[in-house]
UniProtKB/Swiss-Prot annotation:
Belongs to the D-isomer specific 2-hydroxyacid dehydrogenase family. PdxB subfamily. This is Erythronate-4-phosphate dehydrogenase. NAD(+) binds at residues 147, 232, 257. Its main location: cytoplasm. InterPro entries: D-isomer_2-hydroxyacid_DH, D-isomer_2_OHA_DH_cat_dom, D-isomer_DH_CS, D-isomer_DH_NAD-bd, Erythronate-4-P_DHase, Erythronate-4-P_DHase_dimer, NAD(P)-bd_dom_sf, PdxB_dimer_sf. Catalyzes the oxidation of erythronate-4-phosphate to 3-hydroxy-2-oxo-4-phosphonooxybutanoate. Coiled coil: none annotated. The active site is at 208, 237, 254 (proton donor). GO terms for molecular function: 4-phosphoerythronate dehydrogenase activity; glyoxylate reductase (NADPH) activity; hydroxypyruvate reductase [NAD(P)H] activity; NAD binding; protein dimerization activity. It catalyses: 4-phospho-D-erythronate + NAD(+) = (R)-3-hydroxy-2-oxo-4-phosphooxybutanoate + NADH + H(+).
Length: 387
């Protein structure tokens, strides 16, 4: 069996190596010629899987995408050819949730304010949006949810997008990218909606770049410096609008979901599904793939301080490092060839490929001899909190 896998997908050899020959490929430049002899195709969001890509293949038995979203997959075509497909819903939800939470803590520190006491609106209450809400609610932050696609069958309380933008001090976007329908999300935040944001709004996008009209965002930010931006996704990836970057407080190259746990979870979910398709028992465990937990003795009595919580979060992941690398890579004049977007030269994709996958809060095992109520730290995701 020939297994074609994105070169940036971890643990493929450990999980799929017994099944056949594995060939690692560049997912963004994958061609029909490369795919023609594959029995299994494992991709990420940078690969568009459609009739054109699969036109030379008559042997494909399975397509798996280690992603939450599926807008890069022509599922109708796969179904018409009888090719089983699965993605990995929720695989990196915890990573995205913690990324957004840490970004909010960083903004609070930078602008000498407190996250606790603000109202946070979450647009899109699926796996990733719910993970953000989980962190915020564990910390005691008021959360508003907007998701017209699920609210009819979901017991949680929802508000309209208009009500959310009127009330929320912070807005975090977690929707799939859809171009059609009553609830399309392409340019959901267009020039008018951006202009109508309340003063001093923090706007975070960790889903798809085109959910915000980036050209309009440049225009609005020039007029409204009070709006603070955190962008992990960009219109036109892997060539973001470089003129937007200086307007962004925290800028990263679509790596919000890049935790070691999240990446392992995504690959493992594809492994489980393929084994089911093949009728073979999945006898490998995900926990065996991951390094052991870190241990850290901390004074939990100090953690009610938001700055102390930020320091603990930075021990797991310091978002400022990725922001600095992003700016250095894409805006460093010495790296820009005349007449070319620097993303083409040293780029966006290279940062993603070489990203050192961070750990999630659960990788940090805390211990304390103090008497503080620490249940909220367990709810936030940290491991082994005890006395």
């Amino acid at each position: 069996m020939k297994i074609l896998a994105d070169e940036n997908m971890p643990y493929v050899e450990q999980l799929f190596g017994d099944l056949g020959t594995i060939e690692a490929v560049n997912g963004r430049t994958l061609t029909s010629e490369q795919v023609k002899d594959a029995d299994v195709l494992l991709v990420r969001s940078v690969t568009k899987v459609n009739q054109a890509l699969l036109s030379l293949n008559t042997n494909l038995k399975f397509v798996g995408s280690a992603t939450i979203g599926t807008d890069h997959i022509d599922q109708s075509y796969l179904a018409s050819q009888g090719i089983p497909f699965t993605n990995a819903p929720g695989c990196n939800a915890t990573a995205v949730g913690e990324f957004a939470f840490i970004a909010m803590l960083e903004l609070a520190k930078r602008f000498d304010t407190e996250l606790k006491g603000k109202v946070v609106g979450i647009v899109g209450a699926g796996n990733t949006g719910s993970a953000v809400a989980k962190c915020l609610e564990a910390y005691g932050v008021e959360v508003l949810l907007n998701d017209p696609l699920i609210e009819a069958d979901d017991p949680r309380t929802f508000v309209s997008l208009e009500a959310l933008t009127e009330r929320a001090d912070v807005i975090s976007l977690h929707v799939p990218l859809t171009k059609d329908g009553a609830h399309k999300t392409w340019y959901l935040f267009d020039e008018q909606r951006l202009q109508n944001l309340k003063p001093d709004t923090w706007l975070l996008n960790c889903c798809r770049g085109e959910v915000i009209d980036n050209r309009a965002l440049i225009k609005i930010k020039a007029q409204r410096p009070d709006i603070k931006l955190v962008l992990d996704v960009w219109e036109g990836e892997p060539e973001p609008m470089l003129e937007l970057v200086p307007f962004v407080e925290l800028a990263t190259p679509h790596i919000a979901g890049y935790s070691l746990e999240g990446k392992a979870r995504g690959t493992y979910m594809l492994y489980q599904k393929l084994m089911a398709v093949l009728g073979i028992d999945a006898d490998k465990s995900m926990t065996s793939l991951l390094p052991t937990l870190w241990s850290q003795q901390v004074s939990l009595d100090e953690l009610p301080s938001e700055k102390a919580l930020l320091q603990l979060s930075r021990f797991v992941y310091d978002l400022r490092d990725d922001d600095e690398l992003f700016r250095k890579t894409l805006l460093d004049d010495s790296s820009i060839k005349a007449g070319e977007n620097s993303a083409n030269n040293n780029g966006f994709d290279l940062m993603r490929k070489n990203h050192k996958h961070r750990r999630e809060f659960s990788a940090l095992k805390l211990a304390s001899a103090g008497q503080s109520d620490v249940d909220w730290l367990l709810n936030l995701g940290f491991s082994g909190v005890g006395r």
